[in-house]
Amino acid sequence: INSIGATIVPVLVGYLIGTISSETSIANANPALFLAMGIFALAFIVLFSMNIPEPHAAAAVANGVKNSHSPLSFRHFVLGAIAIFLYVGIEVGIPNIANLFMTGSTEANGLGIDTTTAGSVVGTYWFLMFIGRLTGGSLGAKFSSKGMLSFVSLLGLVFVLLAIFIPETQMVNMPVFKADISFGLAQVPMSIMFLILCGLCTSVMWGGIFNLATEGLGKYTAATSGQSRLPSQ
């Protein structure tokens, strides 16, 4: 659901905002902001009305035994928390920077692409993450977390290097939704395409890092599961 929503929202927001120009103001984003407020309100109502039991937390309170060690005493857990912090910056940074570059005016060294098309390109990144998670889930039993994480990290590095060194004049056609919500092909720099392909790589990184960071922690697993999420917030 998360990946599907992330695929659709950039296209929808791009359509609601319209073409960015010198006259564009924050008021153009009001429809998208009102939509976000409605989603947050709905999520609050659903969570407030549901009773979600937490048996592990209740058992820990009932036990009342203070652990002599902290989860931070495990070196691989600390490294995993740092890795998740860096990963989240990369995961959200790639589509955000790509979107700013595509929608920026040509006077500001941007591409001047309309927001709907740019949002569709960015949505492809999140859609590839969805595909990657499905693929990673089916292959998870056949390959170790370390092996899978090493492979996608190397592949992502190759994609980023290609995006850096390929000239912006090298163009490629990508399937997108356009400003009139018609579906077709749009020319974007090949470097943008390689950044979008990084979605396949980032799709399984969080799970791989989490598995390696919490491996062999025994009774500390529950505590570290929550703490390892803090860098991603």
What is the meaning of each model-derived region?
Residues 9, 13-19, 34-60:
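C-terminal membrane-cytosol helix-exit motif in multi-pass small-molecule transporters
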Residues 143-209:
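C-terminal transmembrane helical hairpin of 12-TM major facilitator-type secondary transporters
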Residues 7, 126-134:
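Residue-level signature of mid-helix packing/kink "hotspots" within the transmembrane helices
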Residues 54-80, 182:
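Juxtamembrane intracellular "pre-TM" segments in multi-pass secondary transporters
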